């Protein structure tokens, strides 16, 4: 089915852009990193991907730049996106693709993984020092 192929290719594109963003950050090329993050956002919106997919690159960039307020705001939006059901078939690009029944539960199961990873990652210490960190934890911990 063409819709499935488009959806799969859109996710492959997002993954490729995230990998390229990693390389740009490793090469200490902030201009290219920002361009790649912006491109990932635009591509995600054009291809009607989930908010989580659209916000991943800007969060990755903000975290790498250790921009605490921006990273915290984006992490909050990422986590919130995992609490909202995403109906893939509502997109005009994918009207015939069914939303899997277990998708919402699967999305929610990512929340503790993300919070735990962020809480343990030494590179995220700056984020845990942000004034809004305890409130974010309280909002999403179950």
For each feature predicted by the language model, list its residue ranges.
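Alpha-helical protein-protein interaction modules
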Residues: 2-142
């Amino acid at each position: 089915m063409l819709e499935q192929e488009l959806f799969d290719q859109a996710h492959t594109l997002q993954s490729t852009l995230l990998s390229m963003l990693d390389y740009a950050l490793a090469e200490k090329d902030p201009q290219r990193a920002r361009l790649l993050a912006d491109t990932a956002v635009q591509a995600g919106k054009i291809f009607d991907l989930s908010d989580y997919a659209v916000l991943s690159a800007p969060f990755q960039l903000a975290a790498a730049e250790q921009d605490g307020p921006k990273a915290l705001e984006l992490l909050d939006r990422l986590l919130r996106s995992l609490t909202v059901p995403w109906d893939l078939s509502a997109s005009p690009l994918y009207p015939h693709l069914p939303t899997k029944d277990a998708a919402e539960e699967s999305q929610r199961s990512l929340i503790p993984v993300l919070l735990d990873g962020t809480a343990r990652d030494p590179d995220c210490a700056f984020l845990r020092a942000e004034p809004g960190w305890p409130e974010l934890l309280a909002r999403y911990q179950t």
